[in-house]
Curated annotation (Swiss-Prot):
It catalyses: a quinone + succinate = fumarate + a quinol. This is Succinate dehydrogenase iron-sulfur subunit. Residues 133-163 form the 4Fe-4S ferredoxin-type domain. [2Fe-2S] cluster binds at residues 53, 58, 73. It comes from Coxiella burnetii (strain RSA 493 / Nine Mile phase I). Its cofactor is [2Fe-2S] cluster; [3Fe-4S] cluster; [4Fe-4S] cluster. It holds the Pfam family Fer4_17. PROSITE patterns: 4FE4S_FER_1, 4FE4S_FER_2.
Length: 235
């Protein structure tokens, strides 16, 4: 197989360029794209990429594979053509090769306060939920912050410092929907500006690329609905 990888070293290169590598994938251990990239790195150790668990859990090896954002560790080689084009996640500054600067992404994640807020007196044990209340979190808590969704979103490309983005808004709704959280109104009020939520144009790329098959656009729609209901009720 041929792997065309975007290369960029800011210390030596004026701009990114593509470099082709040939690899006999039948001779490597593993059946995933990440295994092939690791095999290439053994021969070319200057290729820069992020990886950690290699099990689709940590979200660290997100990249653009033949034009679609995905995790290299769960992308099977048998599903790819003989020529594979690999680029870094779009919309982020490139640190080196396939490694991008995700500082802005995490700043938007931090903005939504991704943790339980509850000003009620803490119980002696855990805060209980009914099975029905717990079920409302399905499709929300599974996000691994790989940034495949946000980096596929044109609205996020245009306003990365103002639009929270699909991943951040998915996490926001995960706590808005949590019965153990008592700050729903404060969370909604913090996003009632023209950009935080309402820059979503329902392009749906976020749901298309999510490796966990989550739907950030659905969560964004629910946030908007709750905002409108709150406005109509005069709260």
């Amino acid at each position: 197989m041929t792997f065309s990888i975007m290369r960029f070293n800011p210390e030596t290169d004026k701009k990114p360029y593509m470099q082709d590598f040939e690899l006999d994938v039948s001779a490597i251990q593993g059946k995933m794209l990440l295994n092939a990239l690791e095999a290439l790195r053994e021969k070319h150790p200057d290729i820069g990429l992020r990886r950690s668990c290699a099990e689709g859990v940590c979200g660290s090896d997100g990249m653009n594979i033949n034009g679609k954002n995905a995790l290299a560790c769960v992308t099977q080689l048998k599903d790819l053509p003989d020529r594979v084009v690999v680029r870094p996640l779009p919309g982020f500054p490139i640190i080196r090769d396939l490694i991008v600067d995700m500082e802005q992404f995490y700043a938007q994640y931090k903005k939504v306060k991704p943790y339980l807020l509850n000003d009620q007196e803490a119980p002696q044990k855990e805060r209980l939920q009914s099975p029905e209340e717990r079920a409302k979190l399905d499709g929300l808590y599974e996000c691994i912050l790989c940034a495949c969704c946000s980096s596929s979103c044109p609205s996020y490309w245009w306003n990365p410092d103002k639009f929270i983005g699909p991943a951040g808004l998915l996490w926001s709704y995960r706590f808005i929907a949590d019965s153990r959280d008592s700050k729903e109104k404060e969370r909604l009020d913090a996003m009632k500006d023209p950009y935080s939520v309402f820059r979503c144009r329902t392009i749906m790329d976020c749901a298309t690329v999510c490796p966990k098959n989550l739907n950030p656009a659905k969560a964004i729609r629910k946030i908007r609905t709750e905002m409108l209901q709150e406005t109509e009720s005069g709260e």
